[in-house]
Amino acid sequence: MSEEELTNGPGPEPQPEPLEVESAPLEAAPAGEPDKALLEAQQQASENWDRFVRAQAEMENLRRRLEKDIQNAHKYALEKFAKELLPVMDSLELGIAASTGDAPDVAKLREGAELTLKQFKSVFEKFGIAVVDPLGEKFNPEQHQAMAMEPAGEAEPNTVVKVFQKGYLLNDRLLRPALVVVAQA
């Protein structure tokens, strides 16, 4: 090796010659014929978007329905309990109506029952339970159950002339219909 090769290193490395690549011109699609793959991709994208929008709408509807169900569950949670208390309320009212007499013991019993009834009504009102006492009102089949019909007499036809049993509503939902007698035309 020569001194020059040692100091400068080996001679310049041979550079590869640039290759000439013959490029074929890209064939353009004839005018008026869209690319089939592009059309398929657009169609798939459209279908996916449609599915996405439908899924979003379905989720929104489900969310609304669940919110409504939860609200109703809170609102009407007392329904079974209230239905069980209605006969107790009826019995208390009948007991008060039957407690006639001037004896001091009867008067005390009546007074206690009236106070209890007042407390019952207060609690019912507090929890959204309303009484349906339709005497003299127009017959409403959504809130009243006709037990009999009587000749109208002085009452207008199709009005309630007698109430056998009061009805009750829980937050405007019927707990029990009022049992009534309706004036006949």
UniProtKB/Swiss-Prot annotation:
Annotated InterPro entries: GrpE, GrpE_coiled_coil, GrpE_head
Keyword check for Transmembrane helix: no
Stated family: Belongs to the GrpE family.
Subunit structure: Homodimer.
Name of the featured protein: Protein GrpE
One family name in Pfam for this protein: GrpE
NCBIfam families per UniProt: PRK14139.1 (NF010737), PRK14140.1 (NF010738), PRK14150.1 (NF010748)
GO BP, sorted A to Z: protein folding
Main location: cytoplasm
Keywords: Chaperone, Cytoplasm, Stress response
Gene Ontology MF annotations: adenyl-nucleotide exchange factor activity; protein homodimerization activity; protein-folding chaperone binding; unfolded protein binding
Stretches the record annotates as Disordered: 1-44
Cellular component, GO annotation: cytosol
Protein's job: Participates actively in the response to hyperosmotic and heat shock by preventing the aggregation of stress-denatured proteins, in association with DnaK and GrpE. It is the nucleotide exchange factor for DnaK and may function as a thermosensor. Unfolded proteins bind initially to DnaJ; upon interaction with the DnaJ-bound protein, DnaK hydrolyzes its bound ATP, resulting in the formation of a stable complex. GrpE releases ADP from DnaK; ATP binding to DnaK triggers the release of the substrate protein, thus completing the reaction cycle.
Organism whose genome encodes this protein: Methylococcus capsulatus (strain ATCC 33009 / NCIMB 11132 / Bath)
Subcellular location: Cytoplasm
PANTHER family xref list: GRPE PROTEIN, GRPE PROTEIN HOMOLOG, MITOCHONDRIAL
Domain of life according to the entry: Bacteria
